């Protein structure tokens, strides 16, 4: 079997500068050849640096980034002081990106990171978001179980999961048993999405395919950690 990992050059997480933003929604764009490409629009505009961490003061190098805005009544005193110290407007989300010390030193608190300085068309990215919550779901919807007979003697057991254990030995249900429960509302990352277009004026990223979460949900966009190596590299 051919190994697929040989064509990839994993990038250390400590060297991946990303941006935070929100999912605007899905649409499609057309190429010059008339091909329809489904894309998700991500708003990553106005990413402000709220803190720069260094090896000397914090033990590691990183930058802290915020996105969006928040009403003053929704900001705690501690957060208000943190944003005021950075000279940045209070945001709705805070995210830290670990970087190489030299790279982190290039940023200053209060500065804005432009989308074109991080991403470009044709690049592959990893997008992290919170999936849409589905509430309490049964095994058919949650784990793709098959249903039982609709008739022929079956009554009130059409969508039940069936046996969930054995007998007195082992006398318990094994951990990890697939059963009914809460579905969705978890953090998930979709890898290797192609950046189709970068809207510099509006700070938008158009990535091919779907990303986790509902429209308006927070997302984190990073350069793909498993991006294929460039030819000739």
UniProtKB/Swiss-Prot annotation:
Region entry Disordered, spans: 147-170
PTM field: Methylated by PrmB.
GO CC terms in record: cytosolic large ribosomal subunit
GO biological process: translation
PROSITE patterns the UniProt entry points to: RIBOSOMAL_L3 (PS00474)
Top-level taxon in the UniProt lineage: Bacteria
Keyword Lipoprotein: no
Residues annotated with N5-methylglutamine modification: 168
GO molecular function, one term: structural constituent of ribosome
Family: Belongs to the universal ribosomal protein uL3 family.
Function statement: One of the primary rRNA binding proteins, it binds directly near the 3'-end of the 23S rRNA, where it nucleates assembly of the 50S subunit.
Quaternary organization: Part of the 50S ribosomal subunit. Forms a cluster with proteins L14 and L19.
Record-linked PANTHER family: 50S RIBOSOMAL PROTEIN L3, LARGE RIBOSOMAL SUBUNIT PROTEIN UL3C
Protein name per UniProt: Large ribosomal subunit protein uL3
Organism whose genome encodes this protein: Bordetella avium (strain 197N)
